[in-house]
């Protein structure tokens, strides 16, 4: 079973992603902020990471930079409400950039796509 | 010995050379909180006042795209008016502020007459337009025109408007940019324009151009800042709205898929309702912020307002297990402000303190008379304190450390305090909690001596 780490500060969204992605057949772990995500990443291995950018505490972009160092070959999807970070060169390092919307189809498709490579 | 000298000479010294008087009028005006229009008026004043260059009339054209457009025309309308004005302006000890005030008055009443005459005038600034007055800016030269009616290059409409045979065209240039043109004449004294008048007028032209250029740069900068702030606001609101939309959409889809049992359906609906309320709150807060319109500050009873806010907060304090301790000076004088807005400010500050403090802790509210003219209200929470980097951004719109905040609360408080001439200060130390202090201007006149 493929393992996905979701980094998302909104409680309801964490719940939604967890349920929806579990239903797709993934094993989902959620972290509510960057610190927690890094802690989990240091001791567990994942096949894919989905992260928001602006969160309380450490900035998501900073987190991605740090995760890049830890993740080795793990693909990253930036999943955010901000359109503008798409132009931030730090986010180019991510494998996909998904803008949050009322449909999870795009996010699910990107996950399927990246995990099948 | 060290002696402080004033930058601003209170009046003109008639003994001073007029070049110096002129320079001082123009440069001093840049110290004043004048508008661009007023400062240009000062330059026209310098050119026309007897203690300045002493032309009878000055007209100003401004560049507007590829057109030179008529703006202001300063000067008397008739020889009688000229005599009267010269009498007024030669009053001994008259300061330049009075002269500017006088000219502002002159311009306001002449707006339909003098300036009104040149307002419809506009000339194309194309390279091949070599008529007067455009030639001066096209060739970037000071042009002295004599026997204008015999000169075919003088624009007929312009000549009809100015109605004199001799005038001076001063281009307003900043580096290679054309900012406008000033045209000067001696319609009433009929004194021929002297070479030294031309020199001084040229100098004024350079100052005017430089000033217009700087003012336009400043305006551009203000606009850019406004656009940047607007962009920041749009980005923040987009984010604030997209998150609940994503949640609502996702949980609604689950409901529509029909696989949810009764408990899950109920849970989803509750989440959806919560997110809709959140969206509603965003709209409410934004609307509230945008329509901010405090009333004129009036004296009101701050302690009564504070007591009623504290009383209204009691049930919430009890429910959330926080204690509010208040110390309110019973002899507080009335303070200046909009009572409704101030009430909201106090309520917001106390709610903020609630949210920052852990359950079981105490919030301290005090109100005291600081001195004869200030009353201070302090609200202290029992939170972690605000880190210095966040403290610097406290009053920036859309800056928030709350997961669901809009970052408008403290800015609202600051705007209310600014509107009543008050102050807001923050004191915060890590682990020691944060104190917000509001300073209100008090009104002790009506207070009986104790």
Positions of PLM-derived features:
Chain A
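Short amphipathic alpha-helix used as the core "switch/output" element in two-component signaling
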Residues: 39, 61-72
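Active-site residues of response regulator receiver
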Residues: 52
């Amino acid at each position: 079973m493929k393992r996905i780490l979701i980094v998302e500060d909104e409680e309801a969204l964490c719940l939604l992603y967890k349920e929806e992605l579990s239903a797709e057949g993934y094993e989902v772990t959620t972290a509510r902020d960057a610190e927690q995500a890094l802690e989990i990443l240091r001791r567990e291995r994942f096949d894919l990471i989905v992260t928001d950018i602006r969160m309380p505490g450490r900035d998501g972009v900073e987190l991605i930079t740090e995760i890049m160092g830890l993740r080795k070959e793990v693909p990253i999807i930036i999943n955010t409400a901000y359109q503008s970070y798409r132009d931030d060169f730090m986010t180019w390092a991510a494998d996909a950039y998904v803008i949050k919307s009322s449909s999870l189809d795009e996010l699910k498709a990107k996950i399927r796509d990246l995990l099948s490579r | 010995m060290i002696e402080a000298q004033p930058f601003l000479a209170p009046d003109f010294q008639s003994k001073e050379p007029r070049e110096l008087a002129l320079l001082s009028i123009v440069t001093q005006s840049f110290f004043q909180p004048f508008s661009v229009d007023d400062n240009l008026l000062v330059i026209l004043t310098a050119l026309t006042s007897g203690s300045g260059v002493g032309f009878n009339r000055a007209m100003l054209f401004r560049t507007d795209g590829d057109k030179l457009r008529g703006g202001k025309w300063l000067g008397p309308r008739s020889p009688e008016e000229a005599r009267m004005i010269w009498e007024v302006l030669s009053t001994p000890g008259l300061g330049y502020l009075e002269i500017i005030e006088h000219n502002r008055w002159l311009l306001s009443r002449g707006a339909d007459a003098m300036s009104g005459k040149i307002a419809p005038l506009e000339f194309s600034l194309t390279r091949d337009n070599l008529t007067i007055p455009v030639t001066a800016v096209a060739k970037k030269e000071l042009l002295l025109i004599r026997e204008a009616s015999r000169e075919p290059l003088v624009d007929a409409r312009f000549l009809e408007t100015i109605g004199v045979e001799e005038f001076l065209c001063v281009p307003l240039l900043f580096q290679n940019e054309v900012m406008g043109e000033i045209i000067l004449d001696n319609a009433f004294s009929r004194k021929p324009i002297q070479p030294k008048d031309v020199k001084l007028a040229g100098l004024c032209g350079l100052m005017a151009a430089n000033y217009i250029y700087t003012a336009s740069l400043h305006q551009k900068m203000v606009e850019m800042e406004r656009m940047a702030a607007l962009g920041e606001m749009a980005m923040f609101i987009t984010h604030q709205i997209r998150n609940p939309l994503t949640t609502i959409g996702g949980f609604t889809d689950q409901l529509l898929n029909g696989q949810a049992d009764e408990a899950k359906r109920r849970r989803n609906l509750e989440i959806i309702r919560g997110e809709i309320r959140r969206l509603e709150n965003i709209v409410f807060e934004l609307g509230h912020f945008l329509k901010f319109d405090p009333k004129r500050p009036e004296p009101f009873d701050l302690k009564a307002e504070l007591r009623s806010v504290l009383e209204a907060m009691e049930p919430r304090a009890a429910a959330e297990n926080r204690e509010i301790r208040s110390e309110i000076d019973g002899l507080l004088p009335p303070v200046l402000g909009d009572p409704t807005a101030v009430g909201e400010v106090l309520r917001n500050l106390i709610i903020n303190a609630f949210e920052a403090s852990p359950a079981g802790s105490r919030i301290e509210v005090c109100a005291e008379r600081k001195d004869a003219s200030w009353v201070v209200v302090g609200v202290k929470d029992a939170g972690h304190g605000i880190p210095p980097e966040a403290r610097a951004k406290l009053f920036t719109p859309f800056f928030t450390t709350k997961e669901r905040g809009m970052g408008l609360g403290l800015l609202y408080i600051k705007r209310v305090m600014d509107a009543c001439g008050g102050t807001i200060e923050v004191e915060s130390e890590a682990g020691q909690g944060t104190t917000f202090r509001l300073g209100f201007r008090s009104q002790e006149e009506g207070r009986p001596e104790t």
